[in-house]
């Protein structure tokens, strides 16, 4: 370990990275309170003492049109960071997510003799697997949230450390379902279904009608069924309300602004789009069905690019179909409702599933902030 105070360079490109960066800085300061942190940081990282050469919002652009509009600025920032980090010679550079920006930067810094870490593996195990070779050239170490990610990197001899998942650390093994119900105004004994049609406009457009029709079918069987629908922002809420007015105008439900985790915790089952929400739902111990639909050409292309047997993280973690995945033409109200029925019923199917959810939760609950900090410090030796 260097005798001088550590200097650690970091680049975070979005809110999730800011949260991870702040947790990492906190854990590092416990071991090295005099360490210096510099780079691209959001408000949480800055509140932990990171000196921001650029604000995180400069990198937080999504979509091809937005990226093209900001390309000159993004390239300038990357060149400037390369120059300034090379002059600074930090003990280690940590690129937090934002792979399109960070992996190239990591490669340039590694060429200058600076140790580099990429924190949060891109989904190379699922598609565009050849990216693993670029990552291997650019980084000294990848920090992975999930055990199957490390197994993938091991196949290609790319140094990778499984650190557990921060979300698993944040959520209790045994959730407080009744506290979530009190917060949402749901009766303690009510039967409750959560609908989560996604966070993107295209997802809400493609999934909402089928999800609403599924809820109507289930309400015919369970007339007292409570339905909660968390929506990530006012735009998605307005979009969902417009679809509901056409498809299920008279179906009673609780529309929530945000509160996705509370909805999962409070519900007996959930119908959701794939993605991080499926992992969060597993950690909330809420049985789920994954439904997903996309434009036909996009689905055709995805089937040829994606190299995994499953799309949802619970199934990838379990290595088998733990939760039903009804994709594209299978994503139909009758089939979705049939898959949800045994999850709403209190019985052995549900109990076995919840026990497996708890086992998987333990497998990825490793205190990720401390594990990440330990990996950073080992590389500084």
UniProtKB/Swiss-Prot annotation:
SUPFAM superfamilies in the cross-refs: UDP-Glycosyltransferase/glycogen phosphorylase (SSF53756)
GO biological process: lipid A biosynthetic process
Superkingdom, taxonomy of origin: Bacteria
Function: Condensation of UDP-2,3-diacylglucosamine and 2,3-diacylglucosamine-1-phosphate to form lipid A disaccharide, a precursor of lipid A, a phosphorylated glycolipid that anchors the lipopolysaccharide to the outer membrane of the cell.
Gene Ontology MF annotations: lipid-A-disaccharide synthase activity; phospholipid binding
Pathway listed: Glycolipid biosynthesis; lipid IV(A) biosynthesis; lipid IV(A) from (3R)-3-hydroxytetradecanoyl-[acyl-carrier-protein] and UDP-N-acetyl-alpha-D-glucosamine: step 5/6
Similarity annotation: Belongs to the LpxB family.
EC number of the protein: 2.4.1.182
Organism from which the protein derives: Erwinia tasmaniensis (strain DSM 17950 / CFBP 7177 / CIP 109463 / NCPPB 4357 / Et1/99)
Protein name: Lipid-A-disaccharide synthase
Gene: lpxB
Reaction(s) this enzyme catalyzes, per UniProt: 2-N,3-O-bis[(3R)-3-hydroxytetradecanoyl]-alpha-D-glucosaminyl 1-phosphate + UDP-2-N,3-O-bis[(3R)-3-hydroxytetradecanoyl]-alpha-D-glucosamine = lipid A disaccharide (E. coli) + UDP + H(+); a lipid X + a UDP-2-N,3-O-bis[(3R)-3-hydroxyacyl]-alpha-D-glucosamine = a lipid A disaccharide + UDP + H(+)
One cellular component (GO) term of this entry: membrane
